[in-house]
Regions:
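Active-site neighborhoods and metal-handling regions in enzymes and metal-associated proteins
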Residues: 1-462
Length: 462
């Protein structure tokens, strides 16, 4: 965890923004895989980490904006716990380490909430994403589980988005630590991408690198020859010479800040000319996005400019036709680029996505676009210094989507389907960097993973 003053300052700032009421911050409990004692890898709730910093199950935080008092609710371990799990600091000592003086047994949260309800105090919480947290809030608040989701505090969400979007220097350092691990994961994958090796062997190796650095992976690894599937978690295929693999993988730092990178690697060390033609369009799109990022720009506008770069490159190859700006305005590029350019990143790989992307990636000025493709853009709002974002353009040839568009004559005016059909077995290419928005532009976080085709080929050959 960080210095206790970091968490005290964050809670004080949140209390000031909220003005009044109590804020409920439940930590995550253990999640069983197949019986109670056999659990999934534990991951603390990111809001709890941000405000209270303690990385263990069985805790509940409360911030009282009326009195200025913060409390951590939890139970000290028993002798049975010590026998099986070893000794641990007391709840009081843990709380003191993050600047909290008040502690109480876990069950005492019920009487505290009852007292607040009796006094007519506003009770704020983030809409839960775990069923057990929803049931706990249902019991605490005395409302139906369906009402728990409906009654999440929009005021709390907006204030936390404001705070967490602008990264502190200590947070940026954590993200760069995760980026360094991510670098090692990706260059290892490049070196292992040989014909005959199984995808799962590479995936297992790079996930091991993340675990060896202490934090583990920041999301399930995507590593596949079938890159036409955007989030392909199947690692069951043997690598074939002449094909490409997409590796979309990242790590968490020990304090749970994320990295998220994607590279596309030629199996056997050499891109074909067809692959290189598409790769260079995606690389140009990636570099264009980085050059356009600066405070005051909307990420929606950058996404659309990148879409024009992709459409223009595909037009040069004879895959698209017509006016490029008109094609993008009509969403024709989304046949090949059917997702958004990027998202916020921090304590979550898709930072604060549990708050609702409408509040994290958009605001009253910039609203989501409903058009296919651009509608998947998770971040459209104006950029500010110390935002951390991803930049991940891609081009994919998805047989089912191509068949649908051709059959229904969707954007026929802008697509040369006869030429596109020659790419049906191509797969896909995605290139992703993590960016820090600076006062005047953008900085790629961490050592940039090899991305120019000759660099990638060099790593893959050796």
């Amino acid at each position: 965890m960080f210095n206790q003053q970091v968490y005290s300052n964050r809670r004080a700032k949140l209390r000031e923004k909220m003005g009044s009421g109590i804020i409920l911050v439940p930590g995550n409990s253990e999640s069983p895989m197949n019986y109670t004692e056999n659990t999934y890898h534990y991951r603390q709730d990111s809001t709890f980490l941000y405000l209270f910093g303690l990385d263990m199950p069985g805790l509940f935080g409360l911030i009282d904006a009326n009195t200025g008092k913060d409390t951590i609710y939890g139970d000290d371990i028993t002798i049975e716990d010590i026998i099986w799990m070893g000794t641990k600091p007391s709840i009081r000592d843990l709380a003191a380490s993050v600047g909290v003086e008040s502690v109480a047994p876990f069950k005492a949260i019920f009487s505290k909430v009852d007292q607040a309800k009796g006094q007519g105090a506003a009770i704020h919480y983030i809409t839960p994403y775990r069923a057990e947290t929803k049931l706990l809030l249902h019991e605490l608040l005395g409302i139906r589980p369906s009402e728990v989701s409906a009654n999440g505090s929009l005021q709390l969400i907006k204030h936390l988005v404001d705070m967490r979007s602008v990264k502190e220097l200590i947070e940026i350092a954590e993200i760069e630590e995760a980026c360094e691990t991510g670098y090692q994961m990706h260059v290892t994958a490049m070196k292992m991408a040989k014909p005959g090796i199984m995808e799962q062997e590479i995936a297992g190796t790079i996930q091991g690198i993340a675990l060896a650095h202490g934090g583990g992976t920041s999301f399930p690894t995507i590593l596949t020859q079938n890159g036409q599937t955007l989030h392909n978690h199947d690692h069951s295929f043997k690598l074939e010479k002449g094909r490409m693999i997409i590796v979309d993988a990242g790590a968490e730092s020990n304090r749970h800040y994320a990295s998220d990178f994607t590279r596309t690697i030629p199996v056997g060390g050499k891109f074909s000319q067809q692959q290189l033609d598409i790769y260079n369009i995606v690389l140009k799109a990636n570099n264009t996005a980085t050059s356009l990022v600066k405070p005051g720009e909307t990420y929606l506008s950058i996404h659309l400019k990148v879409a024009e770069v992709i459409a223009s490159g595909l037009k040069d190859l004879g895959l698209m036709k017509g006016d490029v700006k008109e094609a993008v305005a009509n969403g024709a590029h989304a046949l090949f680029f059917p997702h958004g350019l990027g998202h916020m990143m921090g304590l979550d790989v898709h930072d604060m996505e549990n708050y609702g992307q409408i509040y994290v990636g958009y605001d009253d000025e910039i609203r989501p676009v409903k058009q296919f493709g651009t509608g998947y853009l998770r971040l459209g709002r104006r950029l500010q210094p110390n935002f951390v974002i991803t930049n991940e353009p891609g081009i994919y040839f998805i047989p089912a989507l191509i068949e649908k568009w051709q059959g229904e004559k969707i954007n026929n005016k802008f697509i040369n389907f006869d030429n596109v059909n020659k790419y049906l077995g191509f797969g896909g290419i995605r290139l992703e960097d993590d960016l820090l928005v600076t006062e005047s532009g953008a900085r790629i976080l961490g050592n940039r993973i090899p991305i120019n085709p000759e660099e990638v080929e060099s790593f893959s050959e050796h």
